[in-house]
Design a protein with these regions (language model features):
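P-loop (Walker A) phosphate-binding loop of NTP-binding proteins
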Residues: 49
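Extreme N-terminal, non-catalytic leader segments
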Residues: 2-42
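ATP-dependent small-molecule kinase phosphotransfer cores
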Residues: 73-148
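Walker A/P-loop
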Residues: 55
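ATP-binding Walker
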Residues: 52
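Hydrophobic anchor at the beta1->P-loop junction of P-loop NTPases
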Residues: 46
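ATP-dependent NMP and nucleoside kinases share a basic, alpha-helical "lid"
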Residues: 136-144, 152-185
Length: 195
């Protein structure tokens, strides 16, 4: 595909390289993603560590009529038995990471994925493209509705390369002690478990 001329609307934006999101280019032709450079919708990337206050900022965005797309909700959707993602996870980590209904068994998947850096990288290399594809579908749907601004709430915004489609990045930060207190309160766990 030829590089498009940069316009004020697309300045600073680029289409993802095929090597970055091979899964997406496998499912759609490059011209099908051209709408990303022509979008009339501002995309805000919202990220930060757990307990920093991303959910609070996301609620503020929603209160100001900014459509919020939540990465965790997308993961729940792609983990459904109807998605190809669980089968791909089983091929990588073994069938024991799936429940009888074909959905991932999160504790078993976490145990397998967090057993090594390589396995965690493998998990991310499988899940992130599925999440990105669904995110792009949702953004395209919002653009069709005339939505002017979308916020994408994603703890792994940079790790998944989702930042590449964002016009603005908002990173929510808080002191570690504040985050630990919030995590303990939110999840009902002891401070040692929050570490």
């Amino acid at each position: 595909m030829k590089a498009e001329k940069s316009t004020p609307l697309t300045q600073g934006c680029r289409l993802p390289k095929a090597s970055e999101w091979q899964f997406i280019t496998d499912l759609s032709e490059p011209q099908d993603l051209r709408w990303l450079t022509l979008k009339k919708c501002r995309i805000i990337g919202l990220t930060g560590q757990t307990g920093a206050g991303k959910s609070t900022v996301a609620k503020l965005f929603a209160e100001h009529n900014i459509k919020v797309i939540d990465a965790d909700s997308i993961v729940h959707k792609i983990y459904s038995g109807a998605s190809v993602c669980p089968k791909t996870l089983a091929a990588a980590f073994g069938n024991e990471v799936l429940n009888l209904d074909g959905t991932p068994n999160r504790p078993r998947l976490a145990k397998a994925a967090f057993s090594s850096k390589e396995n965690l990288a493998l998990l991310n290399s499988i899940v992130h493209p599925f999440v990105m594809y669904e995110l792009l579908l949702q953004i395209k749907s919002e653009i069709a509705k005339g939505t002017e601004t979308v916020a994408y709430d994603a703890p792994q915004l940079f790790e998944s390369n989702s930042d590449l489609i964002c016009d603005v990045i908002v990173s929510v930060v808080a002191e570690k002690s504040v985050r630990m207190q919030r995590i303990c309160s939110r999840d009902g766990i002891a401070p040692e478990a929050a570490e």
